[in-house]
Amino acid sequence: MRTTKVYKLVIHKKGFGGSDDELVVNPKVFPHIKLGDIVEIAHPNDEYSPLLLQVKSLKEDLQKETISVDQTVTQVFRLRPYQDVYVNVVDPKDVTLDLVELTFKDQYIGRGDMWRLKKSLVSTCAYITQKVEFAGIRAQAGELWVKNEKVMCGYISEDTRVVFRSTSAMVYIFIQMSCEMWDFDIYGDLYFEKAVNGFLADLFTKWKEKNCSHEVTVVLFSRTFYDAKSVDEFPEINRASIRQDHKGRFYEDFYKVVVQNERREEWTSLLVTIKKLFIQYPVLVRLEQAEGFPQGDNSTSAQGNYLEAINLSFNVFDKHYINRNFDRTGQMSVVITPGVGVFEVDRLLMILTKQRMIDNGIGVDLVCMGEQPLHAVPLFKLHNRSAPRDSRLGDDYNIPHWINHSFYTSKSQLFCNSFTPRIKLAGKKPASEKAKNGRDTSLGSPKESENALPIQVDYDAYDAQVFRLPGPSRAQCLTTCRSVRERESHSRKSASSCDVSSSPSLPSRTLPTEEVRSQASDDSSLGKSANILMIPHPHLHQYEVSSSLGYTSTRDVLENMMEPPQRDSSAPGRFHVGSAESMLHVRPGGYTPQRALINPFAPSRMPMKLTSNRRRWMHTFPVGPSGEAIQIHHQTRQNMAELQGSGQRDPTHSSAELLELAYHEAAGRHSNSRQPGDGMSFLNFSGTEELSVGLLSNSGAGMNPRTQNKDSLEDSVSTSPDPILTLSAPPVVPGFCCTVGVDWKSLTTPACLPLTTDYFPDRQGLQNDYTEGCYDLLPEADIDRRDEDGVQMTAQQVFEEFICQRLMQGYQIIVQPKTQKPNPAVPPPLSSSPLYSRGLVSRNRPEEEDQYWLSMGRTFHKVTLKDKMITVTRYLPKYPYESAQIHYTYSLCPSHSDSEFVSCWVEFSHERLEEYKWNYLDQYICSAGSEDFSLIESLKFWRTRFLLLPACVTATKRITEGEAHCDIYGDRPRADEDEWQLLDGFVRFVEGLNRIRRRHRSDRMMRKGTAMKGLQMTGPISTHSLESTAPPVGKKGTSALSALLEMEASQKCLGEQQAAVHGGKSSAQSAESSSVAMTPTYMDSPRKDGAFFMEFVRSPRTASSAFYPQVSVDQTATPMLDGTSLGICTGQSMDRGNSQTFGNSQNIGEQGYSSTNSSDSSSQQLVASSLTSSSTLTEILEAMKHPSTGVQLLSEQKGLSPYCFISAEVVHWLVNHVEGIQTQAMAIDIMQKMLEEQLITHASGEAWRTFIYGFYFYKIVTDKEPDRVAMQQPATTWHTAGVDDFASFQRKWFEVAFVAEELVHSEIPAFLLPWLPSRPASYASRHSSFSRSFGGRSQAAALLAATVPEQRTVTLDVDVNNRTDRLEWCSCYYHGNFSLNAAFEIKLHWMAVTAAVLFEMVQGWHRKATSCGFLLVPVLEGPFALPSYLYGDPLRAQLFIPLNISCLLKEGSEHLFDSFEPETYWDRMHLFQEAIAHRFGFVQDKYSASAFNFPAENKPQYIHVTGTVFLQLPYSKRKFSGQQRRRRNSTSSTNQNMFCEERVGYNWAYNTMLTKTWRSSATGDEKFADRLLKDFTDFCINRDNRLVTFWTSCLEKMHASAP
């Protein structure tokens, strides 16, 4: 009921009355309004659209007769405050939207997140510009559509489609520099100018208007053909990238990267760079002045490397889950070509490209600078490689509907638009003319529409075929020829089935074949030759044209179409014009189906079977009145003229993504009569009716309004039960008269692949062509064996997670028509309940199952939830497509290089969807982060790598403020004070990772008082691990020997002792463990390694002395692998003596506590100060417990026992509070004794034997566990329980050991030491070498190595702030050791996380790191990986910076280190280079090699302290042996070897993960990396003699210290 009563409109600001609601109403004024109602608000006489809002809150104290609306909303809808408005409640059904566009920026939103956001919007109102927020995801409503018109507001129901558009996508712009770029267009502009000054300039302006922040890569590409007879004519070093095409010509493909992965506010400056490159381009690609090369010619655009270029970008897009960035979503490739959109391509590559593009949901836009031709474009002409001497005429064509193409019209063209130089077709001829033409009436009865085009006939090929055959009775020959072929190919029926034999004798005007062929391009010829084209009437019994997208199966063709009489006469002679697909469907019967035919000149009507691929992008566009998708950049000529005339080409109106469903098509469903249970074959009308096909010349190519005539093709098709796309042009204009403008919308805000699709195969198809496999999961069944605090997911949550995971992998939810309950007599498809009866989410009704169908390519999943059981049914094609693997070599000039091309290779391949391990993933989701299932590579989990770097703000700031030189980082070693500060900061950072809240922090990590000055941890020396490299010059690096000497000296003098022991003796410095078994990285079941681990660590003292007679770690580790050898002795291990002390300590413990509480702190203070190294352990323990002066114990935390402390803090406390303990080493010894006496124990309750210095949790043993000893008697139970607890403890808490650096007693740079510092593989082996010399406990060292693995794993609950209702978890891998001179790595791997929530957590870490004196940045994984590797990027090549050592050589000497032993040369060189890197602020980046699926390259890698740049030494760390050393180059081609064999230098790579979000004063500004590069290069080539100066200063140090 509409009321005409008026109310006053008042406005409020957001947050008014404590709520954010846009609408506030008073229930007293509006008694009939209840919560959730939709209210329409409008001024009585207003032309603006009325506002719809949902009532979310009622407020009684609002004044009478008013309604209050949010200020921002009133501004959008131009509502005037304090004026009268009507207020009416409306029925949601009347105002439901069909399509909502949400735009977002600077975020990564996964498809699962999109779906959950969409569900949260159901049953709400949307209006333009509305801000939407969900779980930290922010988006804004763009366009809203109802049917085919845009509206301002509306209601979102379950059926509303939501499309996401991203203004920060990954965009690749390829500019095809084929020879036409140097030609002039018809308006006198160079095509290059049109592309750059015209199109690109317009594009960049539009980006700016729309406030886009895309991450852009711009590449110029072209193909150079060489006039050569054999490969030998090319220089040897370049032969790797020379290829031969199908005609035997030699060519080379060039890619010049202009910018890579850049984000800029202002892109127009780039145009200048591109213009400069245009001038040099012919020289770059060897068209001019190429010495040693044969003559080169640029290819035309048609013969260029178009598909290869977009495949290179797909190789990057394929890996969107690796190096996952949190501030961009979406992928787009734009190719700018000077041609008209015709390309000669390789069939296999075309099919592969299509599969990759569609399955991965990537948008590809082709922007043509040429004039739009009169045939369908884009058009692929396929090389027929198969048989070069094939007599077949005509070429194979394919119209790739999966490419969104645009024609760019420059501004100068718009003025000249009164004349269009595209030849118009002749008008309709009067009937009298027809008679003259002698048209036989039998060819078409008058009642039939004159103009229905033959669906695809290549006229010229047909002519040539006709005129080629000798003899009078051509028609007969044709038939026999055809039927032979028919038998051969046993083919699919083609829709243009012309029954040639029934045609009257053909006119005998002959044309030479050449002329016929040439006519294909001369459009007027169609008119002239019309009289020879007597097209006989085809039978109406036709089948589908294999669409360029469609994966249609030949099998149904045969089953449905086997009526032999029609079949036999139906195949159309030898038109070899066709779609590419069907060639590949090789059937078990051994016949190869014939390809269906495509005629590029008649694209406007091809009945296409609707397939899932063709439908994949359909839900991105609004729908026109007859159900077709509206693509606004396709204008018919009239509207184009109007638009241009009125100057209103509003770019926002152009819509439509990828799917170029031949002009204006997709009349998706004409008939609503189809029942879900309809299993009929899909053309069910009889084959007897005939359909006449009018002649092109008579009919003007389909200029008829759509007829209602039953016999016309369209209607007969549309009545079929299976939806067929009649790819028809708008009624009055034939397809190729449709002028295609530029799709600016998809070029500025590309759409993400829609979440839904409506293609569903019929039941018959599913049964015939698919194999079915299913499995059940009971998510809630295994609650009992979870640890009590583990979160449990309900079946409903797991079910939704399953849907999310499928969406994340690119599946789409199939939306099915509602309400038609199948007739009980007909079994419903696959015995399912009415599918989807309530749209996206069917809620659990009693005895009803929740069910979703999802599809991707030709795989379908049905996921059902019933009675807490989830059933997954997968339908896989019986005859999967074979997709080729294509090896491609090319020449690449990376962005940082001006003109040097390197030869690279990659593989293009497509992963088979069928092979994804869904069963494993579903189990992983059910296990919700417990360690039964770990992430495996094939799941394609998302991953990001972070490094924690010491922040060097002052030095970085000096450089950004204009300091001339950048080698100011290694000036002076860090002061002790700074090191303590950093260690303290690190402890606080890890505390943050562990989410531990602490009380006041005044004195936790004690700063060193004056008395302690001597104690040192050295400055940034590299830790010597497997990856390690030697200590940088000028720093105190050390060898075992020097440390020993130092230790002896230290007995004499305490001051010295403090300095050295720390570096040497400490018993529990952490290890970079080399032990094989110990790294629990990526093992299939973390449980196993937990258990194994324990046996190693737990082995009791009594046994161990016998067990490890002073072996080094490596040997000890191996026997452990079977896990049994140690298990034997665990039973009897506890010797009685121990249990005795254990008991005593408890009693003392009790007294200790009471005394602490009673006595006042001053007396305690005395106790503390009088502690000495000779005090008993229990006294020290008492002092530790003291509330004010003791170690600060951790407050009670969930999952940690009481009385816990952090090992680093207790060590520092001992050094500060106990006399006689001057060094960490001594403190660690005392703690080690306490551990052995069982006064303290590891917080997991584990009987660890080693005290580890670092961020490790230990607890003071109290009397609360008196039975501990007794419990441990039975070996087995104790053992397994312990392992489980321990493993779960390890997966909950971050624990990191500190590596103590070794000290060198001299100032001599490491590379000039008389003997090189030893480089033990790990701390532990270093440790054992010391202890051996002192007869110490080397088993402890071995155990230590096992206890501190290289890398550890934690399962993180990501949702710290409870943003979502789902369980969010990820696996976090981190370094087991922390060293002040190496980056600390943290890697996140996830499947089930809302990206926005994860980003929020990591941003928290980032802020925490900053406050602790560090910098946490996302970094590339494998910055130096080859293009063909998992982590490689085909357009990224590293930069080599040579180090000019020749200027340092003495006269007559061959090597820099001639005065030393030859076998140390390379190690010294390595140390020398490291010293230089160190001066420039590089620290070691010990990446975990296990993450790569290639052998660890073992090349030392460094990262700059700002996180902006990586360095790599181009040779491995192994000792240099006589054989040649090869730099990591892209091919094994010799050119690399020539210039880098003995060439010393560095590889340089930018960290492209460092976006604006992460920048701070510690990372420097955007120009920082370039400045660093320039200065570093200058230093290395010895500009201003800087390198020599550095070298001499090092030599002086060496001579000064010489005796």
Curated annotation (Swiss-Prot):
<dbReference type="GO" id="GO:0044877">
    <property type="term" value="F:protein-containing complex binding"/>
</dbReference>
<dbReference type="GO" id="GO:0005764">
    <property type="term" value="C:lysosome"/>
</dbReference>
<keyword id="KW-0597">Phosphoprotein</keyword>
<dbReference type="Pfam" id="PF19418">
    <property type="entry name" value="DEPDC5_CTD"/>
</dbReference>
<dbReference type="InterPro" id="IPR027244">
    <property type="entry name" value="IML1"/>
</dbReference>
<feature type="region of interest" description="Disordered">
    <location>
        <begin position="427"/>
        <end position="450"/>
    </location>
</feature>
<feature type="compositionally biased region" description="Low complexity">
    <location>
        <begin position="494"/>
        <end position="508"/>
    </location>
</feature>
<feature type="compositionally biased region" description="Basic and acidic residues">
    <location>
        <begin position="430"/>
        <end position="439"/>
    </location>
</feature>
<feature type="modified residue" description="Phosphoserine; by PKB/AKT1 and PIM1">
    <location>
        <position position="1530"/>
    </location>
</feature>
<dbReference type="GO" id="GO:0005096">
    <property type="term" value="F:GTPase activator activity"/>
</dbReference>
<dbReference type="GO" id="GO:0031267">
    <property type="term" value="F:small GTPase binding"/>
</dbReference>
<comment type="subunit">
    <text>Within the GATOR complex, component of the GATOR1 subcomplex, made of DEPDC5, NPRL2 and NPRL3. GATOR1 mediates the strong interaction of the GATOR complex with small GTPases Rag (RagA/RRAGA, RagB/RRAGB, RagC/RRAGC and/or RagD/RRAGD) heterodimers. Interacts with SAMTOR; interaction is direct and takes place in presence of methionine, leading to inhibit the activity of the GATOR1 complex.</text>
</comment>
<keyword id="KW-0472">Membrane</keyword>
<dbReference type="GO" id="GO:0005829">
    <property type="term" value="C:cytosol"/>
</dbReference>
<feature type="region of interest" description="Disordered">
    <location>
        <begin position="484"/>
        <end position="527"/>
    </location>
</feature>
<feature type="region of interest" description="Disordered">
    <location>
        <begin position="696"/>
        <end position="720"/>
    </location>
</feature>
<comment type="function">
    <text>As a component of the GATOR1 complex functions as an inhibitor of the amino acid-sensing branch of the mTORC1 pathway. In response to amino acid depletion, the GATOR1 complex has GTPase activating protein (GAP) activity and strongly increases GTP hydrolysis by RagA/RRAGA (or RagB/RRAGB) within heterodimeric Rag complexes, thereby turning them into their inactive GDP-bound form, releasing mTORC1 from lysosomal surface and inhibiting mTORC1 signaling.</text>
</comment>
<dbReference type="GO" id="GO:0035556">
    <property type="term" value="P:intracellular signal transduction"/>
</dbReference>
<keyword id="KW-0963">Cytoplasm</keyword>
<comment type="similarity">
    <text>Belongs to the IML1 family.</text>
</comment>
<dbReference type="Pfam" id="PF12257">
    <property type="entry name" value="IML1"/>
</dbReference>
<feature type="region of interest" description="Disordered">
    <location>
        <begin position="1135"/>
        <end position="1165"/>
    </location>
</feature>
<dbReference type="GO" id="GO:0034198">
    <property type="term" value="P:cellular response to amino acid starvation"/>
</dbReference>
<dbReference type="InterPro" id="IPR055213">
    <property type="entry name" value="IML1_double_psi_beta_barrel"/>
</dbReference>
<feature type="compositionally biased region" description="Low complexity">
    <location>
        <begin position="1154"/>
        <end position="1165"/>
    </location>
</feature>
<keyword id="KW-0225">Disease variant</keyword>
<feature type="compositionally biased region" description="Polar residues">
    <location>
        <begin position="518"/>
        <end position="527"/>
    </location>
</feature>
<feature type="modified residue" description="Phosphoserine; by PIM1">
    <location>
        <position position="1002"/>
    </location>
</feature>
<dbReference type="InterPro" id="IPR036388">
    <property type="entry name" value="WH-like_DNA-bd_sf"/>
</dbReference>
<dbReference type="GO" id="GO:0005765">
    <property type="term" value="C:lysosomal membrane"/>
</dbReference>
<dbReference type="GO" id="GO:0048471">
    <property type="term" value="C:perinuclear region of cytoplasm"/>
</dbReference>
<keyword id="KW-0458">Lysosome</keyword>
<keyword id="KW-0832">Ubl conjugation</keyword>
<keyword id="KW-0343">GTPase activation</keyword>
<feature type="compositionally biased region" description="Polar residues">
    <location>
        <begin position="696"/>
        <end position="707"/>
    </location>
</feature>
<dbReference type="Pfam" id="PF00610">
    <property type="entry name" value="DEP"/>
</dbReference>
<dbReference type="InterPro" id="IPR048255">
    <property type="entry name" value="IML1_N"/>
</dbReference>
<dbReference type="InterPro" id="IPR045838">
    <property type="entry name" value="DEPDC5_CTD"/>
</dbReference>
<protein>
    <recommendedName>
        <fullName>GATOR1 complex protein DEPDC5</fullName>
    </recommendedName>
</protein>
<keyword id="KW-0887">Epilepsy</keyword>
<feature type="domain" description="DEP">
    <location>
        <begin position="1187"/>
        <end position="1262"/>
    </location>
</feature>
<dbReference type="GO" id="GO:1990130">
    <property type="term" value="C:GATOR1 complex"/>
</dbReference>
